[in-house]
Design a protein with these regions (language model features):
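Catalytic cores of nucleotide-sugar-dependent glycosyltransferases that transfer UDP/GDP/TDP-activated
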Residues: 1-238
């Protein structure tokens, strides 16, 4: 039973938005804030896809690149965890992707684990591009993350004196994947490690690479209508 959760971004196509049905709503606790969240759902090829609705955070002209991205994605992580009992879904594994979901494991294991509903859940964290890390000032520990300063001071959430969402995702993951076995090796070296190679080397026994998949029907250059000209292996002489 695999289900997906994403923010309800403005950029989602109207054809999908027309299918969305409200499922539940409630309040997310984020540090000192109490914030509304809504959950809408579609069935996409037999898979349930949930959309976290909060227009203040997600009704914008692009997906990310805002001054409050630290707050937006901390909110998203807490909203996902908060909604699970309300939709009656108790996953064995939560698969998180990149820095935007880096706090999922932090919140799960430092806060939500107090509730037996969550205690069996594990985190898989996938790194697509280590360059983008979600780096923020230490002050967000109190103002946004709302967890003890100790988690910064002991290095769990800290890198180079800042809160680092990417590192947080790795520290709290039960297992880490990257986009290839080669990349999994490369990021253990300073040139590719983006200041996180030291931690990555300590965690290498729970890191592996999985090659990105490709839908050969959707991305078939012989039939693809979105490219300037179709072609096959026979188009170009040897």
């Amino acid at each position: 039973d695999v289900r997906l959760v994403i923010p309800k971004y403005s950029q989602i196509a109207d054809s999908f938005r027309a299918q969305m049905k409200p499922v539940t709503h409630g309040i997310v606790n984020l540090a000192w804030r109490q914030l509304y969240y809504g959950v809408e759902e579609i069935d996409w090829n037999g898979i349930k896809v949930y959309f976290i609705d909060n227009e203040w955070y997600f009704k914008r002209d692009r997906l990310y690149g805002f001054d409050d991205d630290d707050e937006r994605f901390a909110y998203f992580c807490r909203a996902v965890l908060t909604m699970l009992p309300k939709i009656g879904f108790q996953p064995d594994i939560i698969h998180c992707n990149d820095w935007h979901t880096g706090l999922m494991g932090v919140f799960l294991k430092e806060d939500f684990y107090h509730d037996p509903f969550y205690q069996h859940m594990k985190i898989i964290y996938t790194i697509h591009n280590l360059k983008y890390q979600g780096i923020y000032p230490p002050s967000i520990m109190r103002d946004i993350i709302g967890l003890p300063q100790e988690l910064f001071d002991n290095g769990n959430l800290e890198c180079d004196g800042c809160v680092n969402y990417m590192k947080s995702g790795m520290v709290y993951a039960d297992y880490i994947t990257t986009v290839s076995k080669t990349y999994a090796q490369e990021i253990t070296y300073p040139y590719f490690g983006e200041h996180l190679d030291g931690y990555i080397r300590t965690a290498r026994d729970r890191i592996t690479g999985i090659i990105n998949g490709l839908d050969e029907d959707a991305y078939n250059p012989a039939t693809d209508t979105h490219i300037a000209a179709t072609y096959t292996a026979d188009t170009f002489p040897a």
